[in-house]
Amino acid sequence: MLNDSAGMAVMSENPSPTLSSDEIPLADIYSFLSENDDVEAFRRWVELSSPADTSRLEPCRWLAQQVAFIDELISEQIDAVLHNKRFQALEASWRGLWFLIDAVVNPENTKIRLLDVSWKDLARDMERAPDFDQSGLFHLIYNEEFGTPGGEPFSVLLGDYYVAHRPYEDHRIDDVFTLQGISRAAAAAFCPFVCSAAPQLFGLDDFDNLGLHINVDEIFRSHDYVRWRSMREHDDSRFLALTLPQVLMREPYQDNRRSRRGLRFNESVAGKDNRKYLWGNACFALGTVLIREFSEVGWFSHIRGVPRDHYGGGLVTQFPTPAYRTDSSRATVKMSTSVTVTDQLERELSDYGMIALCHCFQTQYAVFNNCPSLQIPKVYAKKSATANARISSMLQQILCGSRVAQYIKVIVRDKVGSYTTAESCERFLQNWLDQYTTGRDDLSWEMMARYPLREARVVVDEDPAQPGYYSSLVHLKTHYSVDHLVSELRLTTSLSQIDIGKV
């Protein structure tokens, strides 16, 4: 009816006043809403919203006007619900989980488990535990899986949380202490933990100002970050990773006008900032990259950068990028990230252990160019040793080394009682590692997936104080290089004929 051009012309020439919601008495509105009889409710609505003179209005046009007025009122209420801060956080979490599930190509080798626990409960778990190995998180990821025969070790933990260096308004939790406990549990289970940095970590109220020129080096060198730097210097912080900024989880709802039935709802996202858009945790974007890489090659090294003519590496392709409404061809799209991260800012954030999601200019994609862990790489006298320490602290190296360590633990656990000496155990593990090792440098991606190691050696020693207990030292060199440098990863774990209690 509203599409009738003749009718619209008549209405524009003879506009009729209608009562807004502010002009209707509140008692009459409650009476209308509480009425159970549809006919009586319609009669009351007509009485409340009818103009003073309806003789010049045709019934169909008047009804169309009332339907549009009702749509406007309902749209305002839906906007209020959708843009509520708590509702946005809930919707973003579920949509982030959906993106992870949608990224799974082969359900047989990729499993996703959901643990519904708040950051407050996780912090309380770490505070009440006498030590990290007595916490509930350690029991879930280590005792029930990694440390139990038949259990399936976790490869990575994605936490939909935002952390900072100290408590702030509406967040009275010591994140540093909680992260320290999580890092120790994650290191024991060889399972990195990934969450996001809160804007308060940079002294900001939101990520909108992150795109402005800020001195990252000056921020993290201040006295307020002493505990934060101390946590990053610990070896177990290699199993922590922080992503930023936020990523768009859903395009604004828009009426496609293909049907005249139902509500004509267009979500209103206009404002002085972008808070009405649905932003979510960037750890979900990194999770889709990890799932895609593991589904393709069963390995985690190609999770950064953009390879030529290939949807792989650190390229993020699943998340929405709404087009500008003035562009009917959708050739020009908005960013999928909440703020632009420049090359210089990305390098500065990477130096301080942050994994930045960068929008690819004039495309519908984003990319992780670097994947550092939170650890501060150690500095040695030799430049080669310092470079090796920097590369070994990167998340892709930790993920690859952790995968090998988990396999070694499971293999030895299944061979309990079959080894008479440490040498026989060492020989068995070395033969197993040699199956995935080759010294060739001219390998294709497919061959590197089959032989991911350039060099591997293992040393197994028996603990003289504890018969039946073995400790292993594994040295790994992968084929995947970073900035033309090849790193060596060193893993230490204890092997027991009874159980593994320390890493």
Model-based region annotation:
Residues 2-120, 127:
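N-terminal-proximal low-complexity accessory segments that begin disordered
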Residues 45, 73, 77, 93-100, ...:
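Generic, well-ordered alpha-helical scaffold segments in large soluble proteins
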Residues 90-94, 108-119, 441-463:
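Long, charged, glycine-rich C-terminal linkers/tails
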Residues 92-165:
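Long, charge-patterned amphipathic interaction tracts in eukaryotic proteins
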Residues 146-334:
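Extended, regular secondary-structure scaffolds
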Residues 263-428, 437, 480, 484-489:
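Long, contiguous, structured domain-core segments that constitute the functional module of a protein
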Residues 424-449:
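Short, hydrophobic/π-rich interface segment
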Residues 457-503:
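C-terminal edge-of-domain segments
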